[in-house]
UniProtKB/Swiss-Prot annotation:
InterPro entries: AAA+_ATPase, ATP-dep_Clp_protease_ClpX, ATPase_AAA_core, Clp_ATPase_C, Clp_protease_ATP-bd_su_ClpX, ClpX_bact, P-loop_NTPase, Znf_CppX_C4. This is ATP-dependent Clp protease ATP-binding subunit ClpX. Keywords: ATP-binding, Chaperone, Metal-binding, Nucleotide-binding, Zinc. ATP-dependent specificity component of the Clp protease. It directs the protease to specific substrates. Can perform chaperone functions in the absence of ClpP. It comes from Nitrobacter hamburgensis (strain DSM 10229 / NCIMB 13809 / X14). Component of the ClpX-ClpP complex. Forms a hexameric ring that, in the presence of ATP, binds to fourteen ClpP subunits assembled into a disk-like structure with a central cavity, resembling the structure of eukaryotic proteasomes. The gene is clpX. One of its GO terms (cellular component) is HslUV protease complex. One of its GO terms (molecular function) is ATP hydrolysis activity. ATP binds at P119, T120, G121, S122, G123, K124, T125, L126. Residues 3-56 form the ClpX-type ZB domain.
Length: 424
């Protein structure tokens, strides 16, 4: 175990595993009753690493197909078929890349980071959140609006890798195979065409900082709980195999695309549509890298996002489905709230259409549906806990339009409170 020998060597310490003396190794670590040398520690780490790799290969043998991923997305996200296909294929290929790199070393497969462009409330963030539910790799979301260059007030880009590491329970091997979604990426566009006016610490500066981690670098991340000791070493995370998905509304990009379209077709045969005559999602379909450069993204940043997926505007039919079809649909959520009061909440089909039209008029997409429902049901939710005998509340189109109040149906059918008089 510990001390062996006679004479001068009686105080010499030996490794309990390989038997080498303290003079033959760089360091000898003492336990309660044993010693282990640095060489045996490294050997143990190599064994653990190999076992982790083999377990990763086994876990990725059943790679989910793009159709399987898309099917799960369909359960939560209505419409956006093209964007779902792009994301499903990208995630599937991400799994395949990791599997290929673990097993083979002949051809290096480069990753294809993704840029999601779509109007407000079209489902970009929801797609990313739903992916987080179904993936077997660590996943994190970051907000680009909070990022600044290192050294300035705000979060620096290394914080993104720290969040990914936290989602992997500080397992560096797993974090290096994760997926990062960066929201509001359009907010870090260059603020001015003249870079010499002021230092753009939250725009072009952040783009430059993101370039490194998106392309692949070794980021230094503080260990769990932060650095409590000055000599405590940072964790090194290689970002080469981390897939980055960036999303943004890119408000105003449609004008740049439309302007380019007008300059390319002139003459009597040219068909020119004003931007307001076409839906934003339809215009986004024609986006080119040069449009993103004019918007304020630097060429190097655009080059690191080779896959561009555009999302469509949500029409009335899609918004109605969003209200009722997904597993966590808004109507189902409010019906559950009313069930807690033992009351049934019913929406007429015309009422759902009126709610969808309101969201379209406000140009808020699916994100605006909750605020519309809140305003419609506010008075009802305020009154109901104090009322007795109500078993059903019916919401009609007139209620949504503000010309009537909800219909309360009481348990005693002879006493039906039909509060459908016009509101003052």
């Amino acid at each position: 175990m510990s001390k062996v020998g006679t004479g001068d060597s009686k105080n010499t310490l030996y490794c309990s595993f390989c038997g080498k003396s303290q003079h033959e190794v760089r360091k000898l670590i003492a336990g309660p009753t044993v010693f282990i040398c640095d060489e045996c520690v490294e050997l143990c780490m190599d064994i653990i690493r190999e076992e982790n790799k083999s377990s990763l290969v086994k876990s990725r043998d059943g790679i989910p197909t793009p159709k399987e991923i898309c099917k799960v997305l369909d359960d939560y996200v209505i419409g956006q078929g093209h964007a779902k296909k792009v994301l499903s294929v990208a995630v599937h290929n991400h799994y395949k890349r990791l599997n290929h790199q673990t097993k083979h070393n002949d051809v290096e497969l480069a990753k294809s980071n993704i840029l999601l462009i779509g109007p407000t409330g079209s489902g970009k963030t929801l797609l990313a959140q739903t992916l987080a539910r179904i993936l077997d790799v660590p996943f994190t979301m970051a907000d680009a609006t909070t990022l600044t260059e290192a050294g300035y007030v705000g979060e620096d880009v290394e914080n993104i890798i720290l969040k990914l590491l936290q989602s992997a329970d500080y397992n560096v091997e797993r974090a290096q195979r994760g997926i990062v979604y960066i929201d509001e990426i359009d907010k870090i566009s260059r603020k001015s065409d003249n870079p010499s006016i002021t230092r753009d610490v939250s725009g072009e500066g952040v783009q430059q900082a993101l370039l490194k981690i998106m392309e692949g670098t070794v980021a230094s991340v503080p260990p769990q709980g932060g650095r409590k000791h000055p000599q405590q070493e940072f964790l090194q995370v290689d970002t080469t195999n981390i897939l980055f998905i960036c999303g943004g509304a890119f408000s105003g990009l449609e004008k740049i695309i439309s302007a380019r379209g007008r300059t390319t077709s002139i003459g009597f045969a040219a068909q020119v549509l004003a931007p307001e005559d076409r839906r934003t999602g339809e215009i986004f379909r024609h986006v080119e890298p040069e449009d993103l450069l004019k918007y304020g993204l630097i060429p190097e940043f655009v080059g690191r996002l080779p896959v561009v997926a555009t999302l469509e505007d949500l029409d009335e039919a899609s918004l109605k489905k969003i209200l009722t079809d997904p597993k966590n649909a808004l109507v189902k959520q409010y019906q559950r709230l009313f069930e807690m009061e033992n009351i049934e909440l019913t929406f007429a089909d015309e009422a759902l259409g009126a709610i969808a039209r309101k969201a379209i008029e406000r140009k808020t997409g699916a994100r605006g549906l909750r605020s519309i429902l809140e305003s419609i049901l506010l008075e009802t939710m305020f009154d109901l806990p104090g009322l007795e005998g109500v078993e059903e509340v019916v919401i009609s189109r007139e209620v949504v339009e503000g010309t009537a109040r909800p219909l309360y149906i009481y348990a005693d059918r002879s006493d039906r409170a039909s509060e459908t008089s016009a509101s003052a």
